[in-house]
Structures are given as C-alpha cells and as structure tokens.
Design a protein with these regions (language model features):
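Adenosine-phosphate binding glycine-rich loop
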Residues: 2-27, 223-224, 335-450
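Flexible, glycine/charged-enriched surface loops at secondary-structure junctions
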Residues: 22-25, 43-48, 121, 158-167, ...
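Rossmann-like adenosine-cofactor binding region
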Residues: 268-367, 372
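Glycine-rich phosphate/diphosphate-binding loop of Rossmann-like nucleotide-binding domains
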Residues: 196-199, 204-313
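General beta-strand structural signal in soluble alpha/beta enzymes
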Residues: 162-166, 190-194, 239, 262-265, ...
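Glycine/serine-rich phosphate-binding loop and adjoining beta1-alpha1 elements at the start
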Residues: 98, 117-233
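Structured beta-strand/loop patches that form or line metal/cofactor-binding pockets in enzymes
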Residues: 44-73
Length: 450
C-alpha cells in the first residue's frame, strides 16, 4: 500500500494520465510501494521532482512499418521504441514482435528494464521496443522484408552509444540478423554493440542463447543456498513456456539436480513424470517450430492438457514461470502453495499478478522477482557489447562464469537491500530498492533540465 504522500500523489497523477495502460501502472505501483523506506530517507528527491521524472519515459517513438507479403500485398504494422531512462548508460532492452504489443506494455517493460539493468552493475539504461507484427506463419522472406522496413525507420534513433536493442518474444537470431544487416547498409558502418543477440560470425557472444534461463537458475540456486541452506538437488520443478528462456532454464535446472516435469505453450502444457525430454523439446521448438502437444504424442507416459493456465496445478517444489506477464493469478498461486511449492522465481517479465505475489509472501514462499531473477539475458547482452568494444570473443566458460557471478551478485544486492529497507528476505522490495538507488543517485548527480 502507498502511504508516502509524495509517492501517492505521483502515482495518482500517473494513473489519471495512463488509465488505459494497466501493465505499466501495475509495474510502477509495485516499485513505488517497495521504495517508500528509501524515499522517506531522501527528502531531496521530492524537491528535485525525481519520481515524476523517473516514471515518465525520456522518449517514445512510434512509426509505421509498411512491408510486402509473398502475395505482393502491402501490409502495415506499427513500430515502437520506448527510450525510458539513460541515467546510467545508453538505453538497453529488447524488441518484441507479437500481436499483443502496444505502447502500455512496452512502457511497463522499459520501466522494469531500467531497474533490471541497474541491478547487473553494467552501464546500461532502460528501454524496450517492438511491433504488433506476428512472425508466426510468415515465410523467411516476409520476416526479412518486415525486419528491413522496421530498421529503416528505427536506425535513426539507435546506436552503440545511444540505444542498443536486442531480441525478445518473436525476435530471435534470424530477426536480429536481418535488422543488423539493414542497419549496416543504411549507416555504412559495422557497430557491433548497437544490437545484441547477433550470430557468432558477426559479433555475437557465446552463452547468449542460454543466458536468461541459466541466469534464472543461478539466481534461484544462490537464493536456495543462502536463505534455505538447500539446492535444486532432488527437487521437482514446474516450468511454463517452451521458448528460449524455458528451454535453457530446464537444461540448467536438470544439470543442477532438479527434475523438470512440465513445459507449455499458449495452447496447453505437457506433464512428464519421468522428467522432460529436453533434446526432443529443442528439436520440436527450435527446428520444427511445432506445438508442445506433439510431445505427448511421442512420449507414452506424458499427458497433454489443453489449458496452459493449469500448469500451476501440478505438484512441485520449485516453480519457474517463463512464459508471459500475469500468467499466475491468485488462484494459480494458491494452487502452487497447496501442492507444496516453496520457491517461485520468475523467468518471464512480471508473470505474477500482485494478488499472486501476496499469496507467495503470506505463505513463506521464497519469491525471486523478474527484474532480479531474469536479468541474465540483458547481463550477457552487456557482456556481448563489452566483447564488441574490445574486438575480442570470450569462451563459453568465461561468459558463463561472468554470468553466474553477476546473478549471484544480484541476489546478494537484493537481499542486502531488503535488510536495509526493514523487509529482510523480501527480494521484491530488495531488488526494487537496490535498482532504484543507483538510478536515483545518477539522476540527482546529472541535474535537472530546465
């Protein structure tokens, strides 16, 4: 609950101006509620209008994206780039291609990205972008033409010292490659650091593909060790999603001794009591781009349920939501607790509703919020930018070791900040406070633009 008058006034004004952007308001409210103890210690923030500036993006770019499909028909989509905050570095955040993309969702993601990037300790500001274009069902040539048209407008707003996008939902290595190629043609320059998630032959980083999923498990393992004197060993793990984050979270959780029994997509989920056959899922999703229900057709002990929301009714010790925002509501959280779940760490962005988070906290569940637990992807993007700047390529083991160190550092920064805020063990409060303080200090030092 917001009790600080200054923060309440800022939020109420924001809610009036952004009434049609519920995801953005949800993200802002969560942060403002968490940072109340910090703001009360710094009355100078109010005088400087710091919070008012923090919750408004520095810039929002909206543009049309015309492209020609394989039938020769002209299609038009809408493109966005939300450049949220550059206090600690150039804007950094992914591009999402999905029909659900709108300005409110991208503002929420850019706002979250600001604090997530701060937690990594790397010099990266917050941003997010994308389009309502749906790459599913499109040919490679259609995707290429769209990506080239998208970058033909976006290129004038980005650069390695200005704004450095990456991939996200619907934007993988194929799309990043097409966009990088178009940027190179338009600018007549090879700026490796202006776009991350690149192929290994033109400046990409080893371990980038695995980074978000691996990082999620490194964070979870460190939290288990330090807060519960426990580990993944022998634990039953439920994972939602079957994209990049879910696949590599499954791989690392299994490597650390857990047994992953579920994966899902937007149509439903599969349950395999023997543990998920990850090699099959990789081939299904990364090569054939098939649906998860095909898993049950080839694995006799597996069952398929045509409702992805029911994945949270499966008994487990650890839940790793890796699909999409607000996928766990109050009822799903209660089902998890009832069935023995004691740890929830988030691989997706804001996958738990505020009501679900209340259920976790009131039942003693170890809760790792997205901005801390899934920061491995952007952390490794930052490491990719470092390699590009050095004109070097690090080994998989070197990148993975740096990633592990960053994720363990994020846990400790979040835990220590939770103690300082009077909420020991509440990693949501801790992550918000730790991420906020670095950004706030930088903003105060850089002055106010009149």
């Amino acid at each position: 609950m917001l009790t600080n008058e200054y923060l309440k006034r800022v939020y109420d004004g924001l809610a009036q101006r952004n009434a049609n952007e519920p995801e953005f308001l949800q993200a802002v409210r969560e942060v403002l509620e968490s940072i109340q103890p910090v703001v009360e210690k710094h009355p100078e923030y109010e005088k400087a209008g710091l919070i008012e500036r923090l919750v408004e993006p520095e810039r929002i770019i909206t543009f049309r994206v015309p492209w020609v499909d394989d039938q020769g028909k002209v299609q038009v989509n809408r493109g966005y780039r939300v450049q949220f905050n550059s206090a600690i570095g150039p804007y950094k955040g992914g591009l999402r291609f999905h029909p659900s993309v709108n300005q409110g969702i991208l503002k929420f993601l850019g706002f979250e990205q600001t604090f997530k990037n701060s937690l990594t300790t790397l010099p990266m500001g917050g941003g997010k972008g994308g389009s309502d274009f749906d790459p599913h069902g499109k040919s490679d040539m259609e995707v290429m033409r769209f990506c080239q048209s998208f970058m033909t407008e976006l290129y004038r707003h980005i650069g390695q010292f200005v704004d450095c996008p990456a991939g996200d939902i619907g934007v993988g290595g194929r799309e990043v490659g097409y966009m990088f190629g178009q940027y190179k043609r338009l600018t007549n320059s090879f700026q490796g650091g202006m776009l991350t998630g690149k192929g290994l032959t033109f400046g990409g980083s080893l371990a980038r593909t695995e980074a978000t999923g691996y990082g999620l498990c490194y964070f979870t393992a460190e939290a288990l060790k330090c807060m519960r004197n426990d580990s993944f060993q022998g634990k039953t793990v439920v994972i939602s999603g079957s994209g990049n984050v879910a696949i590599y979270a499954c791989e690392k959780a299994t490597e650390l001794g857990g047994k992953v029994v579920t994966m899902s997509d937007s149509n439903g989920y599969v349950y395999d009591p023997n543990g998920i056959d990850l090699a099959y899922v990789k081939e299904l999703k990364e090569v054939r781009r098939g649906r998860i229900k095909e898993y049950a057709e080839t694995h006799k002990d597996a069952t398929y349920v045509a409702d992805c929301t029911k994945v949270w009714t499966v008994p487990c010790d650890i839940a790793l939501p890796c699909a999409t925002q607000n996928e766990i509501n109050k009822e799903s959280a209660e089902a998890l607790v009832k069935n023995g779940c004691t740890v929830v760490c988030e691989g997706a962005n804001m996958p738990s509703t505020p009501e679900a988070i209340e259920v976790y906290l009131s039942n003693g569940v170890l809760y790792g919020p997205a901005k801390a637990a899934n920061a491995g992807g952007v952390a490794t993007s930052g490491l990719e930018m470092s390699q590009n700047s050095e004109r070097l390529s690090w080994s998989f083991e070197e990148v993975d070791a740096k990633l592990k160190g960053i994720m363990e550092g994020i846990f400790h920064a979040s835990y220590d900040a939770s103690v300082a805020a009077g909420s020991e063990g509440n990693l949501m409060v801790g992550a918000n406070c730790a991420g906020f303080l670095k950004v706030a200090t930088a903003m105060m030092a850089q002055g106010i633009t009149y």
